[in-house]
Amino acid sequence: MSAPQQVENNRLAAVINDENRETEALFQQFESGVSDPEEGRRLVGEIIYVLVRRVVLRERLVYPAIQRSLDDGDDVVDLEVLADDEVGRLLKLIADTPTTSGTFEPLVARLIEQVRERMGDEQADLLPRLGEALGAEVADELGNELARARDAAPSPESADVGPDVVERFREQVSTSTS
């Protein structure tokens, strides 16, 4: 998939685009092939952590701004939450699947496809609409707040991607950014 054109006319868009680039780099690293199952598991742990952090910070900071600023904000957030739930289900399936299983790579590929589609939609529609609705000053403030929260979030404590990894990472990010 070719990368969507990135809109960076405010700090919020710039911070979200940074997150998207970080996520895409991890996806490309996975897609380039990982020969060692332990390295694959570590990389998937990073992907899970980045996506969980993304969801937690969106729920806390971005979704309320969408609801306040866009006429259809509640509907937009409802759709975002449904998509987040689907990503969460996939993350849990991936965390519970051995890297040597024949279903592991197809699950990760499905996750990557869904997240890329959402990042593209975000670039094409949501970020321009939200930036316009918020205005430059508020979008810049929200972007700065999002960046501070992202920077305050811890790194994963270990590469152990076990059955409760999504909940564990969610708790780590939530606690550190409260």
Question: Which functions belong to the PLM regions below?
Answer:
Residues 1-178:
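Small-residue-biased structural context
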